[in-house]
Every structure is written in C-alpha cells, then in structure tokens.
Amino acid sequence: MDPELLVSIYASTAVSVGIILAAAGLGSALGWGLICSKYLEGIARQPEMRPQLMGQMLFTGGLMEAFPMIVLGMSMWFIFANPFTGAALAAIGS
C-alpha cells in the first residue's frame, strides 16, 4: 500500500469536512437571522401575537439546528471511519 495514497485520501477528506462544516455553520447562522427577522416583523405588525410567534420561532429554530448536528455526525464518520480508505485498499488489491 502506497502511504502517499492514504495521506492524500486523509488530506482530501479533512479539507472536504472543513468545507462541509463551514457551510453548515453559515447556513445555520443565516437561517437564524432570517427566522429572527421575520419574528420581529411579525411582532411589529401584530404585537398581541408575540407569545404564539415566539413559540413558532423557537420550534422552527430547533428544527433548523438539527441540520448542522446531522452534518457534524456525518463529518465525524468521514474523519474516524473513512470509507474511502477501504475502497482504495480494495481497488489496489492490498
């Protein structure tokens, strides 16, 4: 087994995981910004709806925060149980 191949696979995986986690964090931050801005717009239009809007905002935010956690789990899978190394070993017959 060529050690340079494994180093290349691990390096590419690390860079890819970093990009994926950054995109998930950015998406989550933008999502929270949009949710909160719409919440404030709703309160400005109908102040008496504040408790109901707050509940909906927190529920939607919780659902939105599930996505980065799923992405984090998948990223940890790629880092610690990299499926590409097994495929590379099988392809070269080692």
Swiss-Prot record:
Record-level GO cellular component terms: plasma membrane; proton-transporting ATP synthase complex; proton-transporting two-sector ATPase complex, proton-transporting domain
GO terms, molecular function: lipid binding; proton-transporting ATP synthase activity, rotational mechanism
Site (Reversibly protonated during proton transport): 65
Keywords: ATP synthesis, Cell inner membrane, Cell membrane, CF(0), Hydrogen ion transport, Ion transport, Lipid-binding, Membrane, Transmembrane, Transmembrane helix, Transport
SUPFAM superfamilies, alphabetized: F1F0 ATP synthase subunit C (SSF81333)
Superkingdom field: Bacteria
HAMAP family per UniProt: ATP_synth_c_bact
Function: F(1)F(0) ATP synthase produces ATP from ADP in the presence of a proton or sodium gradient. F-type ATPases consist of two structural domains, F(1) containing the extramembraneous catalytic core and F(0) containing the membrane proton channel, linked together by a central stalk and a peripheral stalk. During catalysis, ATP synthesis in the catalytic domain of F(1) is coupled via a rotary mechanism of the central stalk subunits to proton translocation.
Protein name from the UniProt record: ATP synthase subunit c
Organism: Nitrosococcus oceani (strain ATCC 19707 / BCRC 17464 / JCM 30415 / NCIMB 11848 / C-107)
The encoding gene: atpE
